[in-house]
Regions:
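C-terminal accessory module of base-excision DNA glycosylases/AP lyases that mediates lesion recognition
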Residues: 1-34, 122-123, 137-213
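Alpha-helical ds-nucleic-acid-binding substructure associated with the helix-hairpin-helix region
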Residues: 4, 23, 27, 55-56, ...
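A positional/architectural concept
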Residues: 12, 18-65, 69-72
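Structural motif
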Residues: 36-44, 91-95, 184-192
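A general alpha-helix detector
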Residues: 45-50, 82-86, 124-128, 160, ...
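Short alpha-helical scaffolding segments that buttress acidic/His motifs in well-ordered protein cores
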Residues: 46-51, 100-104, 143-144, 194-198
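A broad detector of the eukaryotic-type serine/threonine protein kinase catalytic domain
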Residues: 51, 84, 108, 112, ...
Length: 213
């Protein structure tokens, strides 16, 4: 099994992590089973990730509703023929308009094959996706984790994951992506569960203790 599809998969990974380090046992005691957060793979889900980046949940939902309305049906071809006015009406920032168009072009030109990524390694997915203009490490990581459901995906560049790791593992400073990637090597092949637990742990800490990102 290389993908996470249900809570039973999460529980298997949680048990494996808990045997590696007692810190995970304490995290799990605080969070319980973290949200699965699976979504379909493909262009629409990738577009949703791009739209929601650096927005609050409420803002992301509002902009996404406008994107789906203005650019319906949301396909790569529809994005490529969208006028500048339609893009403006969708509520997307100019950088996100550019990224969405770049992704649509990469798919139609067969430079980005989202179907082939479903059986690829995390490293290949990351390299393949970030080769497209506008797709950064965070976008690739989130797609890998929640759209492909890879059990060993991770999100070392996510600020909430970094902050949760800092608190949980009693680190002096919030780890940089490279530092967190190195720390997470010990969590293979369950880094996808580790990421979900750290997100859930961050949410618990933020709601109860008021930590900030």
């Amino acid at each position: 099994m290389t993908t996470i599809t249900c809570n039973a998969d999460l529980e298997e990974g949680m048990a494996a992590l808990a045997t590696l380090d007692p810190v995970w046992g304490r995290i799990i005691a605080r969070t319980g089973i973290p949200p699965l957060r699976r979504r379909d793979s493909g262009f629409v889900s990738l577009a949703s990730i791009i739209v929601s980046q650096q927005l609050s949940v409420a803002s992301a939902h509002a902009v996404w509703a406008r994107v789906e309305s203005v650019l319906s049906p949301l396909t790569p071809d529809r994005v490529l023929v969208a006028s500048d006015e339609e893009m403006r009406l969708s509520g997307l920032s100019r950088p996100k308009q550019k990224t969405l168009r770049a992704v649509a072009a990469a798919i139609t030109e067969n430079r980005l094959d989202l179907t082939s990524l479903e059986t690829a390694t995390p490293e290949f997915v990351h390299a393949h996706m970030t080769a497209v203009s506008g797709i950064g490490p965070w976008t690739a990581d989130v797609y890998l984790l929640f759209c492909l459901g890879h059990r060993d995906g991770f999100a070392a560049g996510d600020l909430a994951v970094q902050e949760a790791a800092k608190v949980a593992f009693d680190l002096p400073l919030r780890p940089k992506p490279a530092e967190l990637t190195e720390l997470a090597e010990a969590w293979r092949p369950w880094r996808g569960v580790a990421a979900r637990l750290l997100w859930a742990y961050y949410a618990a800490l933020k709601s109860r203790e008021g930590i900030s990102a």
